[in-house]
Amino acid sequence: PQVTKYLLWAPHPDVAATRRVITEKLNAGADEKTWVIESRHRGEVIGLASCRRTAPHSVEVGYCLGRRWWGKGLMSEVLGMLLTALDADREVYRVWATCSVDNERSARLLEHAGFYLEGRLARHAVYPTMGPEPQDSLLYAKILR
């Protein structure tokens, strides 16, 4: 429940649903990429990270990590790698992300990575585990050049 609380999708009801989502991600176009985050020691899947080009020079990043791996600096490392790769793409000027106004850990992660708070988006997104009503989100951005 802690991991899925702030996600924009509901937990998958079964393995078949997870397989469908994985297939969709694998078949996504060039403007959207998703990576599995794997434990170095055990090789088990511990999270996901994604990039989605939302405009010619703008990319949205997203991420989630299993509760057991929180507080170990792993997502900071992953986000750093994504930013390094995006900075190498001379067409990308802006990287952005949103998170629930209640997701303090995600907001701190983004700020630590050099993102700045652009504003609060009123009734921006439905977080399924928080109910059917749209909730406020925070909009963060990092300008690469």
Where are the regions that the model predicts?
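Conserved GNAT-fold acetyl-CoA-binding loop/helix
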Residues: 2-24, 33
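Acyl-donor (CoA/ACP) binding surface of acyl/acetyltransferases
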Residues: 36-145
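A short helix-loop-beta-strand connector motif used in the catalytic cores of GNAT acetyltransferases and
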Residues: 24-36, 47
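Juxtamembrane/interface motifs at transmembrane-helix termini
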Residues: 14-17, 25-28, 39, 66-68
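A general structural signal marking secondary-structure boundaries and capping sites
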Residues: 1, 25-29, 90
